[in-house]
């Protein structure tokens, strides 16, 4: 894969989630030449660490797959936090947990509140979610889900008995079951959708970019690290191309339009390196400002999470699959049949709840796993175990990203300010207490062998917060660092109607950095939707018609609307 030209209609910087969508959609116009520049390597079909769903723990922290970012010392945690970012075609969709969650419809109603953002409400976003999905767990007549999109979604199956007990425990704790957290009712417990198809990871590159590579007007160049934007000599606001390095050599490519899709870390970094950002800050780094946009690198959001781990009394967990002696058999089973323990990401179910009555929609997310293991592969010292991942979904803590120098290869300074507000601390205390209350219900009694982490010694509010500060990890959802918003918003970077950078010509941003607020779930699906919608904007196509559908609203709809625990045909 390499470029065939020196000039293109569109140059897309980043072959990750958004870049893969854009490369495929923009090249549908046969009269337009498209180049995708990816700094990482190719996502080879034979690479087990990418393609095998259960191998998801191996790429993180591995320099061949992961850019290995770290925050600065977080001021309210007293330590640095590792951030894995995909160093491969497909970006982080090639190394993530493969969980597909749209977020709550109310997230997008919040996006649409500012002036000029009305076309980003749920009704306008829904048709693009449906366009990208093939939802095998949804009925053919389901008007909320998509049925013929490039992203193939597996529902559950969550057949391990621990899942059913966990869902029932949620009901015993006063919550409800839901058939589809991406459907009418997000609130409640039930099976999750995952981007796993025929036992393989369904990354954005596999779903979008690979099938489009047969087109003559689409080129993809890997190991191409973009170092700077090129500007018109007579117009400092007009972008005309990019410079990138590959194998130690510098290359230049010209473009009618440049689209930044490097993600929430790389996009603001490249903007600042190019003189777009806070003018005084840029001057302090020896960079001549081109456009004063103080929101570049600000408004930074992420989700923090912890694992609550339990010993399992019955031999039903997947803990034995972590035994190195069993791994060869599990691997061979996957290689030859795409079946067995390696054919699932094992994040097959969980739930969303409100931790208090002050919030209108779920502010806590739970991922349940029938195994006790950390994301880095460190397993709990038990024969059998299970765990729940939990964390607040719309924290009001905000961080920032700032370049350290003019060197494009030097990683930027990153601070998320986790746990920096009283509201954030309160929600964390609620999150742990809600999770523990669910895990101690009768439905879990046959399996509950006692809490391993944090352990019974952690009880008071301060003890809980100390544990979160010590043990909390990123859920890997960085976003909003170059947010969409009207020009009247001094912190907005991207025009929501055009995806162009305010005040600049031929420069757009399409990735997680453009999100105005993070959503209450994993952010991969919202990024795909954003890119699908942006592709129509960039191509000048008529947008898909908005679709106004019902969805569950707490305090307005009946409390049990869409709930499934009383349905005798609901298998969970």
UniProtKB/Swiss-Prot annotation:
Residues at which FAD binds: 9-38
Active site: 477 (proton acceptor)
Top class in the EC scheme: oxidoreductase
Annotated keywords: FAD, Flavoprotein, NAD, Oxidoreductase
Gene3D superfamilies: FAD/NAD(P)-binding domain, Glucose Oxidase, domain 3
UniProt cofactor(s): FAD
Enzyme Commission identifier(s): 1.1.99.1, 1.2.1.8
Membrane-traversing stretches: none
Family listed: Belongs to the GMC oxidoreductase family.
Protein name according to UniProt: Oxygen-dependent choline dehydrogenase
Organism: Staphylococcus epidermidis (strain ATCC 35984 / DSM 28319 / BCRC 17069 / CCUG 31568 / BM 3577 / RP62A)
């Amino acid at each position: 894969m390499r470029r065939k030209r020196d000039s293109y209609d569109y140059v897309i910087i980043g072959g990750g989630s958004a870049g893969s969508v854009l490369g495929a959609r923009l090249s549908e116009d046969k009269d337009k030449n498209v180049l995708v520049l990816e700094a990482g390597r190719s996502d080879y079909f034979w690479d087990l660490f990418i393609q095998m769903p259960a191998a998801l723990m191996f790429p993180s922290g591995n320099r061949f797959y992961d850019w290995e970012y770290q925050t600065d010392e977080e001021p309210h945690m007293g330590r640095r936090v590792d951030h894995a970012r995909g160093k491969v075609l497909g970006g982080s969709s090639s190394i993530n947990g493969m969980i597909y969650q749209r977020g709550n419809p109310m997230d997008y109603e919040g996006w649409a509140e500012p002036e000029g953002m009305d076309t980003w409400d749920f009704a306008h976003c829904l048709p693009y979610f449906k366009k990208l999905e093939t939802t095998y767990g949804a009925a053919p007549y389901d008007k909320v889900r998509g049925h013929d999109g490039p992203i193939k979604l597996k529902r559950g199956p969550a057949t391990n008995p621990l899942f059913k007990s966990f869902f029932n425990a949620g009901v015993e704790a006063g919550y409800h079951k839901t058939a589809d957290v991406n459907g009418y009712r997000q609130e409640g417990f039930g099976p999750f959708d995952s981007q796993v198809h025929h036992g393989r990871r369904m990354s954005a590159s596999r779903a979008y970019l690979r099938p489009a590579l047969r087109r003559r007007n689409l080129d993809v160049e890997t190991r191409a690290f973009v170092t700077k934007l090129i500007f018109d000599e007579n117009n400092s606001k007009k972008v005309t191309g990019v410079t990138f390095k590959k194998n130690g050599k510098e290359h230049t490519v010209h473009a009618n339009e440049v689209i930044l899709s490097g993600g929430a870390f790389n996009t603001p970094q490249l903007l600042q390196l190019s003189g777009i950002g806070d003018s005084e800050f840029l001057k302090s780094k020896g960079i001549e400002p081109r456009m004063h946009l103080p929101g570049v690198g600000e408004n930074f959001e992420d989700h923090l999470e912890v694992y609550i781990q339990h010993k399992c009394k019955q031999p039903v967990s997947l803990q034995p699959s972590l035994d190195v002696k069993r791994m060869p058999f599990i691997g061979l089973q996957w290689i030859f049949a795409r079946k067995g323990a390696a054919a699932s990401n094992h994040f097959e179910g969980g739930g969303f709840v409100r931790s208090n009555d002050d919030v209108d929609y779920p502010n806590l997310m739970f991922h349940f796993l029938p195994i006790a293991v950390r994301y880095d592969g460190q397993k709990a010292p038990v024969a059998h175990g299970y765990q729940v991942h939990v964390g607040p979904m719309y924290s009001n803590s905000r961080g920032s990203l700032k370049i350290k120098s003019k060197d494009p290869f030097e990683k930027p300074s990153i601070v998320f300010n986790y746990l920096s507000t009283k509201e954030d601390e309160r929600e964390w205390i609620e999150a742990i207490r809600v999770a523990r209350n669910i895990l101690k219900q009768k439905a879990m009694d046959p399996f509950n062998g006692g809490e391993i982490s944090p352990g019974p010694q952690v009880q008071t509010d301060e003890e809980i917060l100390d544990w979160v500060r010590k043990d909390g990890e990123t859920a890997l959802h960085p976003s909003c660092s170059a947010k969409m918003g009207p020009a009247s918003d001094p912190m907005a970077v991207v025009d929501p109607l055009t995806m162009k950078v305010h005040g600049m010509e031929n420069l757009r941003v399409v990735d997680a950095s453009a999100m105005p607020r993070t959503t209450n779930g994993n952010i991969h699906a919202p990024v795909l939707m954003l890119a699908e919608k942006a592709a129509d904007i960039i191509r000048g196509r008529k947008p898909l018609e908005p679709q106004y559908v019902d969805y569950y609203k707490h305090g307005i709809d009946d409390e049990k609307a869409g709930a499934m625990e009383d349905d005798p045909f609901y298998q969970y």
